[in-house]
Structure formats: structure tokens, C-alpha cells
Amino acid sequence: MKGRLLDAVPLSSLTGVGAAQSNKLAKINLHTVQDLLLHLPLRYEDRTHLYPIGELLPGVYATVEGEVLNCNISFGGRRMMTCQISDGSGILTMRFFNFNAAMKNSLATGRRVLAYGEAKRGKYGAEMIHPEYRVQGDLSTPELQETLTPVYPTTEGVKQATLRKLTDQALDLLDTCAIEELLPPELSQGMMTLPEALRTLHRPPPTLQLSDLETGQHPAQRRLILEELLAHNLSMLALRAGAQRFHAQPLSANDALKNKLLAALPFKPTGAQARVVAEIERDMALDAPMMRLVQGDVGSGKTLVAAIAALRAIAHGKQVALMAPTELLAEQHANNFRNWFAPLGIEVGWLAGKQKGKARLAQQEAIASGQVQMIVGTHAIFQEQVQFNGLALVIIDEQHRFGVHQRLALWEKGQQQGFHPHQLIMTATPIPRTLAMTAYADLDTSVIDELPPGRTPVTTVAIPDTRRNDIIDRVRHACMTEGRQAYWVCTLIEESELLEAQAAEATWEELKLALPELNVGLVHGRMKPAEKQAVMASFKQGELHLLVATTVIEVGVDVPNASLMIIENPERLGLAQLHQLRGRVGRGAVASHCVLLYKTPLSKTAQIRLQVLRDSNDGFVIAQKDLEIRGPGELLGTRQTGNAEFKVADLLRDQAMIPEVQRLARHIHERYPQQAKALIERWMPETERYSNA
């Protein structure tokens, strides 16, 4: 038996990890040596052989070696250092925008340099921007890497080189310490051991096929993917078992309020809406808490379904809480529910972070006394000081913004007198069946697969940025001649609200100049909620012709007169998000258009993506296509499933394993409860506390 277990060895025991470094590593959930070993590379770089400079092709990542010919600093539009090296077959220009005197001195003429980076075609031949480089000693042969070089997910202040050095130490510890094998012997037979798999994935030998690693097919990956998917499924089984131990208030049929609401509507619910309502009502009549996910495409009428579910609870004298991810969306829900419920004598309350002082206190008192039966708001409705009076149903809108942990915390909060509230979760992001089986294995699923009559399909076109002026003319025509309104959406690669806001402000200034006859508004994530609400209100009332926005308008904004949307750089967004954005138009009876204003050249994947949007308005078709065309390295993150990203598994790539994993998870859950618990702790520690609830 080896020494102590690596899940008990803190990272601070490694050389080079002091208090400051520990805090940085904690930001990416790295606390123990086991955590570090399970923090696997995103991709690999092959630095094991040299490329002749003369044979470099644009877009190829390569290691080159050459002699420094010159190194100069220029002070044009931007301070820059350029260094040229030659290996006899050609000359490479290395460009640096961030540099210091020590770097300049190290690149003295005549020195030999080993450089790695992406080759580009420059003005004077091959170029690399900010390559990694090392000045060679007097060795006649360059010091190349012996294994493929891992590239890890990281955080600010933690360099790749640091993670590689720490991982080297962690791999050495595998010789003296143990990492526990948790798979039952009948499952792990014929598979790589955990230490073998970890060594292979952190330091793959150059003989290993990169294509196997990129597609997730290597036996070392399969070993860990199986374990992670099992842990995920076991956590869902534990959550489900936990939920079934609880009791909810059974809410039997009591349809007087529902019938009044339906009689007052100017339309009849679709067959799909009626079917989903029946599924929800069946759940709510039981004494176990309902945990149901309702998927409906953009505009399929999920809100009406939620309203009917709410009336079932209110008819029994109980309260209902609806939580939305943004104040904008919450306010819109509050308005919809007031319009429907006020004629029925039901009071709708509204709670958001921006409410202060007396108004907030008055609202809290009205909730605590039971005067308000329907409460709508953001996550502010589940803060400590909000006391409910018989909360029987919780509705969460836009599940992929909340995630499993918030869903469960909210459920705990709603517990009163031994009863847990029923839970209804609504998402407009259609989830293909395989993903729903895994990501929402703790929920029952309903699908509203029919759009209400009278919706006009949106015509989508893709146009290059070179025709920007034509599109600006089209906006002018739509707003001035046709009396319509339009959205202009700015997107960014970086998940940075600041940069996104700056991009939107620059576009807003440009469009105000180009369209002086239009009232142009601006909304982005860094504005105060009240400012955002004011802009959206004036757009909804028709005071603004054109709204420049970031992707904050992705969910729930309803302006029927808006019939034109321009999305800049659509190639930067996933299909599901583009489909969500497009759903903001086509809400009235007028023909609506969405223009995908892309920058050339487009990658092959981006071309296919944009084509899918042009061909289809069906969110389920689009979600299925998304599965088929996403590259192997694209992980499914919080945006699309409500779950934290997987470390090794990829629900899209590994979907064929899921039915078998579910069978094995049930086997482990029943036969090996201790291993099941340990697997959840290893891969999904946050879920553990809920499964023990």
C-alpha cells in the first residue's frame, strides 16, 4: 500500500505554491494534488520536432529554430518589438506588443532562438505574434520537448508554465502516494488504471496520435470520461432519491380560476400547451414535490403554461414564486401576470435588487402576510429576509442561467412546515434528448413543440460586413418608411462586460451619425438596472426606432413592432444563442428579418452554422444540428445546460455512452453506495451536500 491519499495532500505542499499562489489556484477549484491531477489539458501542442521556416504554412502551430538577424523597437501607432530569425531555409519575423528591456537584450544578434507559435502570412513573409521562445545555449542540437505540451484551463496570474511545473511534481507524487481506484473491479477490468491514464493525459508521448486525443477516443480519456459521467449520473440519482424522501402539498383539481383565465384570453391554447398543462397538473396532485422541466421554443407560450400552474396553487390558498435571471425579464413577467391575474382578484408582487427602503419593506410584509399570492422577481426573492406564507410552487425561468446548485438552494429555502414546494423550470433553449437525459436526469421533462398560430417565421440572411452601408440603409427604410423598429446586436469573443459595452457604445455612436433622423438607444450589461429598464421601456413604447444592444437582450424581451434584427459577428456565437437572439423579432404579424452581418473569411464550421439558421426556425432542429457540427474541443458549458462544464466528458461527443453509463450508475448506486458517494465527491463535490439533504 502506498502512502497517504492525494485528495488529502494540499497544493501548498508543492514547491512554488505559497499563500498568494494557493488563492489564485483556488479560483479554478484547485485545492489538493488530486484536484490538480484531475485538472486536465484543454488541448495539446506538438513541440517535439522542428519545422524549416521556409516550409511554414499560415495557421500552422510550429516550433522553429533560427539565428537572430536583428531586433528593433518601433513607435508607430503602437509600440512594438520585431525580431527576425533565420534558419537558412527562410526568415521569420516575431512581433511582440508586450515586452521589456530584458527581452530585447536576450534577443541579441547572432543568438540562437527556439520559438513556438502560430505562423501567419505577413508583409515580409512568415510571422508569429507573441510566440513563446527560449534562447538556446551553445548546444549544437536544440532542446526539444520529449512529450506533447499540454495547454491547461487557467486563470489570471497563473501561467501555463506554472501549471506544467506543478503537474510535474504531482505526477512524481503518484509514485509515493495513492489516488483511490473507485470503479468496482467488474467495471474497470481491461481498462487503464487511474494513475496510467493521468500520466498519459498530462504528458502524452510523441508517438501518441493527437487526433485520438482531439476526438476524445484515447483509452486514457475513455477511462476518465466513464468515471466522470458515472459521477454525474450518480449525483442525479442521489438528488432524485433525496427529493422522493420529501413531501409536498398535494394540489388537487380546482379549475374555477383557470377556466376564468382561459375564457378571457383572445386565443385558444395550442394542443402542445394543453398536453404540458395536463402533465404538470398530474404532478402537482401528488404528495411528492414536482420537479419538471418545460422546454419550449422561442415564442411557444411557456408563460401561459406557468400561469395555469400558478393558478392551481393559488386556488388552494397557496403562494407561487417566479424567478427570472434578469430584472428586465422579471419585470416583463410581472406585467404579463398582472394583466392576466388582476381581473381574477389575484395580487402580483414584484421583488428585485433595485428596490430599496420602504417600498421593499412593504412588499416583504405583503408576502409574509399572504396578501400577495404571486411573487415575481430575480434571485432577490430568495434572500434571507423574504418570508413566504405557504409557498407551494416555485417557477424558474431560463434554467440555463441558474444551474443545479441554485435550483436546489432555492428549493431548500421554500421548505415550510415539512413541505417542499413543487418546482417548474422553463427553458427556451431546446435540449436534444440525449443531453436532457444527462443534464436533467433529476427532472421530468415536458416539451411544447408547437407555435401559436399568427406567428410569422423570421427570414434570415447572411451578409458580409463589406455591405454594412447597405444594411444601415435597410434599417433607415424599415424605421422611417415602414414604421417598424429594429435591433442592432453587438457581440464579442471575450466574456467581458466591459469590452462588450465599449464595442456597443462605439457602434451606437457610429449609427447615430449615420442615421441622424432616427432615435437610437443603447443597452448593455454595465448599465445600472434602472437605466436598462428606462431604455427598454422607451423602445417598447415606440419612442426609439433602433436599439443598439449587447447579448443582454437574448431572453424574454417582447416588442411586437420590432421586425428587423442585425447581429454583428454572428460567427462568434453558438447556434442556440443566435436562435435566442433572433427570437426577439417575429413577435407580431408583420414579416420579420434577421441579418447575420459577418466578417470574412468565415471558418467552415461558422459557414455551416449560419446556413443552419438560414434554413430553419425550429429550435429543436437547430439544437440537433448544433450537436452534429460542434467541434470536438467545444465543451458544453453553463450557458447551454445549467451544469458546470465537465472536466473530460463532453455530452455532445460522448452521447453514445450515455445509455450504458446510466445502466452502470444504477448498478453502482444499488450495490456500492460508498464508492458512489466517493465518485460524486471526487468529480462533483458541490452536489454532495444536496444529495445528503
PLM regions: where:
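N-terminal pre-Walker A segment at the start of P-loop NTPase domains
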Residues: 267-277
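Upstream accessory/linker segments immediately N-terminal to the RecA-like ATPase cores of bacterial MutS
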Residues: 74-264, 638, 671
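Short boundary/loop segments of OB/S1/cold-shock single-stranded nucleic-acid-binding domains
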Residues: 42-62
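Inter-lobe coupling/hinge segments of SF2-like helicase ATPases
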Residues: 275-278, 289-611, 667, 671-675, ...
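Structural detector for short beta-strands of small beta-barrel domains
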Residues: 58-79, 117
